[in-house]
Amino acid sequence: MGKAAAVVLVTLVALLGLAQADLTPKVQVYSRFPASAGTKNVLNCFAAGFHPPKISITLMKDGVPMEGAQYSDMSFNDDWTFQRLVHADFTPSSGSTYACKVEHETLKEPQVYKWDPEF
């Protein structure tokens, strides 16, 4: 009985450890409407599937943080990973680069995800 209890205990500890595993965010950068230079739009950065919940998401224009970014409340999925949406109004111009910078403890360094406007 002692061995069986030890096996159960080790299994439970392993499962708890897996439930709290650090998971890297999956990031999507997209606009609300099809891109058109000079036309008002909304730039979105959606990060999902990450754990732990502490994350920094910054919308960038030409490497500089964009003003007016709005952050949705942090929410979690059925598997206890987290997700967050950051968005800002903007008017795309053909000479500018738009991106989303994400910092999370599972990343060795901040990652920059560029928006592809497909003008």
UniProtKB/Swiss-Prot annotation:
Stored Gene3D superfamilies: Immunoglobulins (2.60.40.10)
GO molecular function: MHC class II protein complex binding; peptide antigen binding; protein homodimerization activity; structural molecule activity
InterPro entries: B2Microglobulin (IPR015707), Ig-like_dom (IPR007110), Ig-like_dom_sf (IPR036179), Ig-like_fold (IPR013783), Ig/MHC_CS (IPR003006), Ig_C1-set (IPR003597), MHC/Immunoglobulin (IPR050160)
Matching PROSITE patterns: IG_LIKE, IG_MHC
Pfam families: C1-set
GO biological process: amyloid fibril formation; antigen processing and presentation of endogenous peptide antigen via MHC class I; antigen processing and presentation of exogenous peptide antigen via MHC class II; cellular response to iron ion; cellular response to nicotine; immune response; intracellular iron ion homeostasis; learning or memory
GO cellular component: cytosol; extracellular region; Golgi apparatus; HFE-transferrin receptor complex; late endosome membrane; lysosomal membrane; MHC class I peptide loading complex; MHC class I protein complex
Keywords, comma-separated and alphabetical: Disulfide bond, Immunity, Immunoglobulin domain, MHC I, Secreted, Signal
Disulphide bridges: C45-C100
Signal peptide location: 1-21
Subcellular compartments: Secreted
Domain spans labelled Ig-like C1-type: 25-113
Protein role: Component of the class I major histocompatibility complex (MHC). Involved in the presentation of peptide antigens to the immune system.
Subunit structure: Heterodimer of an alpha chain and a beta chain. Beta-2-microglobulin is the beta-chain of major histocompatibility complex class I molecules.
UniProt name for this protein: Beta-2-microglobulin
The organism's taxonomic lineage, starting at the top: Eukaryota, Metazoa, Chordata, Craniata, Vertebrata
